[in-house]
Every structure is written in C-alpha cells, then in structure tokens.
Amino acid sequence: MLVVPAIDLFRGKVARMVKGKKENTIFYEKDPAELVKKLIEEGFTLIHVVDLSKAIENSVENFPVLERLSEFAEHIQIGGGIRSFDYAERLRKLGYKRQIVSSKVLEDPSFLKFLKEIDVEPVFSLDTRGGKVAFKGWLAEEEIDPISLLKRLKEYGLEEIVHTEIEKDGTLQEHDFSLTRKIAIEAEVNVFAAGGISSENSLKTAQRVHRETNGLLKGVIVGRAFLEGILTVEVMKRYAR
C-alpha cells in the first residue's frame, strides 16, 4: 500500500482548505520545494500536489512554484484546474506525467484518451459530498452515481482514481472507507483514498481494506495530519509498501 503525502498550494504557499472551502484556508510556513525534496529523501516515491488557485480561481499564480517543483516531477502526481489540452501539455513539458483531472473529464471523457496520447498517466479525481459527485474545484455538485460514472470512464481508458470525501478533507476526522471500498470493488479501478486520513487508525483500516480489495485500494493520501505532525513521517513509512 502506498502512503502519499499531500501538498496543496494557494497564494504561492503550502495550504489546506477545510472541507474544500476557501474561507477555511490554513497556511503553513513551509517551502514547497524543500518539503518535496525532504519527502523523497525519506523514501516516499509519490507526492500528491494540488494547485488550489488554479482549481478554484483558474489562476496561474502558483505556476512559478510548479516550475520549481518540476525538478521532482517524476515523483509527483499533479492536479488542480487541468481543464484544457494546452495546460495539460504545458505541465507535461515540465515533466509532470501523472496528472489528476476531474471537471474536464466529466464534460468530455475523451480528454482521458488525449492525455494518454501525450504520454500522460491520467488519474481521475472522484470527489464526493453527501453521496454527490463534486467538481469545478468542489464548487459544483451533481446527482451522479459514482460507480456508473467510473464504469463509463473506463471505456475511455480510466485505470486509477483518487476518491476524496470532501466533508472530511482537512478536518482531521476519520475517513469512512465503506464507499471507497465499494467503489474499488464494484468499479474495478485502482483507488487512492483521501480526506480524513488523519490517524494511525486510518492507516490500519486502509491496510485492511487494501487486503480485502486485493490491492485495488492502492494507497492513501495524507494532507493536514502530515503537515501538522499528527501523522509523522516515521509512522507513515511504517505502513508504506
């Protein structure tokens, strides 16, 4: 099972938004590039980086930070506002091969095929709030059955997703793995669980679900709990494959 540290960027800084709300932003006095470098040195093979400014405001204010982080692009899965062919190509030219996409794929599933054509590994971000699928930086939501949606997207080459429980994101509440487990088994896709991976108990549960799904629960993404030292690097490494 992979344990993936998460770094969100907003206003050029490392940040977390509680439940995805801009007014609930927490900023951290950490240098993004130094943080990524240290994590790689600690042995983490994948880091989850999301540009919240691009996702929510379609702003490229964080692009200079993404350029700095491109030194470590092979270890990063990048997301946030990837809604156009041009922007996806721009990131790919910086070396970002794993790209997290959502809204554009909901509008045009063939975007997945385009990404593969430019040698990108697309990871679909399935964000749910109260059973509804959310998109456009979590500002909009729709009554869509997640399982049916994923089965349809598999026809366009979808293989891997991040499932985020928005109500738990940044709250330090525990992730409910029941829906994540159901998605992995019924849609038969590789899943990273996010939102509420907030304690060692979360990691223990994830490890159990990883076994129950025969590895379809590929890993977990740890944000605020990591940034605030609630889940230490040592503990996360203990559960990482």
From Swiss-Prot:
The active site is at D8, D127. The keyword Isomerase applies. One of its GO terms (cellular component) is cytoplasm. One of its GO terms (biological process) is L-tryptophan biosynthetic process. The keyword Isomerase applies. Its EC number is 5.3.1.16. GO terms for molecular function: 1-(5-phosphoribosyl)-5-[(5-phosphoribosylamino)methylideneamino]imidazole-4-carboxamide isomerase activity. Pathway: Amino-acid biosynthesis; L-histidine biosynthesis; L-histidine from 5-phospho-alpha-D-ribose 1-diphosphate: step 4/9. Its main location: cytoplasm. Gene3D superfamilies: Aldolase class I. It is an enzyme of class 5 (isomerase). Pfam families: His_biosynth (PF00977). It catalyses: 1-(5-phospho-beta-D-ribosyl)-5-[(5-phospho-beta-D-ribosylamino)methylideneamino]imidazole-4-carboxamide = 5-[(5-phospho-1-deoxy-D-ribulos-1-ylimino)methylamino]-1-(5-phospho-beta-D-ribosyl)imidazole-4-carboxamide. It is found in: Cytoplasm. It comes from the Bacteria. Keywords: Amino-acid biosynthesis, Cytoplasm, Histidine biosynthesis, Isomerase. NCBIfam families: 1-(5-phosphoribosyl)-5-[(5-phosphoribosylamino)methylideneamino]imidazole-4-carboxamide isomerase, PRK14114.1. Belongs to the HisA/HisF family. This is 1-(5-phosphoribosyl)-5-[(5-phosphoribosylamino)methylideneamino] imidazole-4-carboxamide isomerase. It comes from Thermotoga petrophila (strain ATCC BAA-488 / DSM 13995 / JCM 10881 / RKU-1). The lineage of its organism: Bacteria, Thermotogati, Thermotogota, Thermotogae, Thermotogales. The gene is hisA.
